[in-house]
Amino acid sequence: METLFRSFRTQLEHTSTEVVRFLHDQIAWDSRLVAILGARGVGKTTLLLQHIKLYDREDESLYVTADDFYFTKYRLFDMAYQFYNLGGKKLYIDEIHKYKDWSREVKNIYDQIPGLQVIYTGSSILDLEKGGADLSRRKVEYRLPGLSFREYLNISQGWQLPSYSLEEILAGK
């Protein structure tokens, strides 16, 4: 498990918090089970690592990617249980769809380790939807879209253009 901690610290060290996507402020980060879905390359991994870096205690958090070689030998549930016993409170699992039988293990983590919060990402919607265990009543789900033109301008030009909902635009606000 030490290799997971080492990899996590390295990833965190190389994560910039200069630009944070809009979805960050809309996520209920204190929910017990959070799913962040979106296409490959939209920034899900960066969003997780930025949140940890800005708001979490590193000694109570662990970021893992579900396709790590570690999981060829060890089960996700066993790793989560061991992490919890070491004082872990928040487990971030990236690319969950790459782990076989992921939904059953996440359900078991949720049901059997109530003191552990789980936040996971996934980009293969088909693999996520065919997960065997029903997580719909347990999870809060968010979708991270690709970069909007407004976000692009904010990043490239250093602007701070606000975001408006369709209702606000139609109302002329």
Q: Which residues does each PLM region occupy?
A:
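Conserved lysine of the Walker
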Residues: 44-45
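Structural recognition of the conserved hydrophobic beta-strand(s) that form the central parallel beta-sheet
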Residues: 117-123
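Pre-Walker A adenine-sensing motif
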Residues: 11-29
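Walker A (P-loop) phosphate-binding loop of P-loop NTPases
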Residues: 40-41
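Conserved P-loop NTPase "ATPase switch" module shared by AAA+ and STAND
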Residues: 85-102
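Interdomain motor-coupling "hinge/lid" segment immediately C-terminal to the ATP-binding subdomain
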Residues: 2-12, 123, 130-173
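Hydrophobic anchor at the beta1->P-loop junction of P-loop NTPases
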Residues: 36
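Short glycine-rich substrate-engagement loop in P-loop NTPases that contacts/grips substrate
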Residues: 58-87
